[in-house]
């Protein structure tokens, strides 16, 4: 989300991403820039009424669109040479479209080290997504761990519970409102609704 800010501050080097992330950013970053502009306008109306100086948006839609020229989409499971001493590989993290666990091989002072970096990891058996790629070794591991100390109870019938709630609400004449992230969860919800529709279940 802050890549356009880096561009605004002068960054002009390549930005390596997975192919899917590159495609998503082409849509999402200019939209994010528009949101930044709108929020700054809203805040500035209040600031001006209070006699305060206006603020600039963190970045705008034009900057967000320009930074996309630096993006280099890469496939999963392919080693990319950044220079003689640094190589990287994107592996499917199974969290959302384009998410990755990154292996980084660094050669420094004749010594090779491997760093693995990952944000969120997906679960197994999720429709629409591949299972996370297992990384077998690393000298250093850096990863997101919001739920690292929790044991999640597997709920194999969560789709059916979801459909039961939707069906029950509609039968009562209610309206179903499902707050969800635009990328990831929304597609899973639409998949489940379409699956039930295609199955002709009531």
Feature-to-residue mapping (PLM):
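His/Asp/Glu-rich metal-coordinating catalytic cores
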Residues: 1, 6-188, 194-199
